[in-house]
């Protein structure tokens, strides 16, 4: 297996397992065997915690760059969330990566503009946000899809449409989250690219992947907060052999 960002991944794996991956790999290359180094060939024992690695992006410093994910490396760092269970570890990681968890106000809203292949998965996500008290807005295709599947949604004109449009809604201060998985591209004039850039400029969290959207919404719906999650002493994570 080849990991493109192994220079980032391996240190995290070593930290949370207590296994010095690089040292062992070098010694194996020099002819030693794992059994001679005190390690077996089976699975490493389960730890009493879960570790989640979350990428960090600096799109506000990268002018004109589309925030939609692709094969290119766009993250500028990563944070590690460690907790006794997956949910708390994910919450730690997302907060450490800069995601905000807001309580919806009377007029708080979310914007949806997603590609056709993602629309079925966003029905449940949109329902959860609606039940939390958010008002939902969507561009024409996304709005029609959500309403068709019994999720109340209001249509908003795209960036190239007449005012009032999605730009006015973004600038209203009422938008807590933008969910945009629509077409990515290098053309900065595309509506989808301009929307994501505008969200970044206004410091509005812009979610561009279904799995991230699911993770964020599940954290929003939980009763947990950072005050409820215990700290993990990272010095105790190492298991000497």
Where are these regions (language model features)?
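Peripheral docking tails and interdomain loops at the edges
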Residues: 157-241
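General beta-strand structural signal in soluble alpha/beta enzymes
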Residues: 81-82, 112, 136-140, 155-156, ...
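Glycine-rich phosphate/diphosphate-binding loops that line cofactor/substrate pockets in enzymes
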Residues: 96-110, 129-131, 169-175
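ATP-dependent carboxylate activation and anion-phosphoryl transfer catalytic cores
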Residues: 4-105
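Short connector loops at secondary-structure junctions
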Residues: 141-159
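Short internal beta-strands
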Residues: 111, 129, 133-146
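A general structural motif
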Residues: 86-92, 114-118, 136-138, 157-167
């Amino acid at each position: 297996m080849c990991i493109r960002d192994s220079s980032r991944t391996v240190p995290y794996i070593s930290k949370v397992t207590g296994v010095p991956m690089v040292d062992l790999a070098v010694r194996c290359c020099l002819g030693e065997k794992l059994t001679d180094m005190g390690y077996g060939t089976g699975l490493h024992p389960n730890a009493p915690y879960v570790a989640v690695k979350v990428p960090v992006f600096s799109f506000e410093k990268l002018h004109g760059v589309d925030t939609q994910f692709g094969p290119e490396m766009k993250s500028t760092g990563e944070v590690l969330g460690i907790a006794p269970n997956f949910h708390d570890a994910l919450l730690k990681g997302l907060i450490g990566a800069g995601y905000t968890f807001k309580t919806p106000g009377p007029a708080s809203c979310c914007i949806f503009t997603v590609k056709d292949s993602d629309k079925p998965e966003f029905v449940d996500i949109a329902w959860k946000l609606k039940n939390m008290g958010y008002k939902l807005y969507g561009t024409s295709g996304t709005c029609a899809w959500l309403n068709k599947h019994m999720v109340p949604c209001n249509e908003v004109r795209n960036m190239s449409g007449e005012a009032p449009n999605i730009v006015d809604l973004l600038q209203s201060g009422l938008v807590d989250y933008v969910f945009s998985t629509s077409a990515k591209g290098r053309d900065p004039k595309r509506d989808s690219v301009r929307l994501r850039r505008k969200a970044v400029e206004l410091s509005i969290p812009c979610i561009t992947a279904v799995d991230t959207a699911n993770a964020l919404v599940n954290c929003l719906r939980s009763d947990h907060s950072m005050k409820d999650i215990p700290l993990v002493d990272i010095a105790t994570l190492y298991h000497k052999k």
